[in-house]
Amino acid sequence: MKTQIQAIHAREILDSRGNPTVEVDVTLECGAMGRASVPSGASTGAHEAVELRDKDTQRYSGKGVLKAVSNVNTEILESLRGMNAIDQEQIDHLMIKLDGTSDKSRLGGNAILGVSLAVARAAASALNLPLFQYLGGEQAARMPVPMFNILNGGVHANWQGPDFQEFMIAPTGAGSFKEALRWGSEVYHELKAVLKDAGYSTAVGDEGGFAPALKKNSDAIELIIKAIERAGYTPGSQIEIAIDPASSGFYENGLYHLRSEGRKVDAQELINLYSSWVDKYPIAVLEDGLAEDDWSGWKLLNAALGDRIELVGDDLFVTNVERIQRGITENVANAVLIKPNQIGTLTETKAAIEMAYGANWGAMVSHRSGETVDSSIADLTVAMGTGHLKTGAPCRGERVEKYNQFLRIEEDLGSRAFYAGHDAFVR
């Protein structure tokens, strides 16, 4: 079978926020084709791979991606044509070398990732394998706990509600992914009713979660617990809570600005707040509890809570093995958030997950707030057996597409599928 790359074609499409992004088609000599599209974040880490934008204010307010598209259709195509799509690492490393920068700013992380994912899809198609099996082999059968972001704050809610960006539920007590998805959907709809009864807006944010104008951060947790109970489930044993404050967004001059509560706190005071919540509420996961470069604060946070809950670094690590290695050495967390577009290739994404595993850390795959209907992260999650992922609320097509892909994968696996459940998190 001829799995050499014959053609690569990129185009500018729109993401879920109506902003341009890159879609790539890779065609092999055997006729197999793979298509992938690239997401975009709202709260981005300062150390992420560069998303190449045109900065032409006459088009899409400067957010066009025609330069990235052109880079795929010329330079990248010329370099990769004739290469074997099955040689994923070789292809990814060639693109990194071709770019020549540390942050993929010349060709664009969005251009490179689109090609990287489309190559994997084309190779899987040529071999007549589902993507998760192509990436993970026969043993890939662990279904993840879905972390549903059902209540939004921070930048995802235009700072109209809680300071903390995401309040999630994790149905760890379910027996399968299919059951977990149902539980999540039921709680989501109960939360809508709870908010309506309390006189709050039920408009949804970028990731499908509700964005009510709450006065206190803890109100979000109280409302979610009420919704869990109203849906007929037990907080803690059946459904746990996860929080992503995205703290870099409210960190300034060494202090954390809790706008909704009208106060500024230092790292230790914020850690004390988290500790009191972990005592009071069934919280299993805290992501980006402190700012991306507050390394000393993260050490204190891990000392306080690292043996009780999963502490995930997102902006702190940006899926970058050098930063993850520093985190492991300095003992600042116990898990890594994995976003392929933060680093820019499938090979580097897998390396980040493997590094986390090597340190007995957890890895949680994640979407971005500006998504597409590409479901590659669902296949990646099962392929790598990460046991949990977050891809928004059970609402909005670009979020639901990932959840529906897990249903297909679980069905495909049949009796071999097993649900991560309570073992999903490091604690």
UniProtKB/Swiss-Prot annotation:
Pathway this chain belongs to: Carbohydrate degradation; glycolysis; pyruvate from D-glyceraldehyde 3-phosphate: step 4/5
Identification of the protein by name: Enolase 2
Binding residue positions for (2R)-2-phosphoglycerate: 165, 339, 368-369, 390
Role according to the record: Catalyzes the reversible conversion of 2-phosphoglycerate (2-PG) into phosphoenolpyruvate (PEP). It is essential for the degradation of carbohydrates via glycolysis.
Name of the coding gene: eno2
Annotated Gene3D superfamilies: Enolase-like C-terminal domain, Enolase-like, N-terminal domain
SUPFAM superfamilies: Enolase C-terminal domain-like (SSF51604), Enolase N-terminal domain-like (SSF54826)
Signal peptide positions on this chain: none
Keywords from the UniProt entry: Cytoplasm, Glycolysis, Lyase, Magnesium, Metal-binding, Secreted
Annotated compartments: Cytoplasm; Secreted; Cell surface
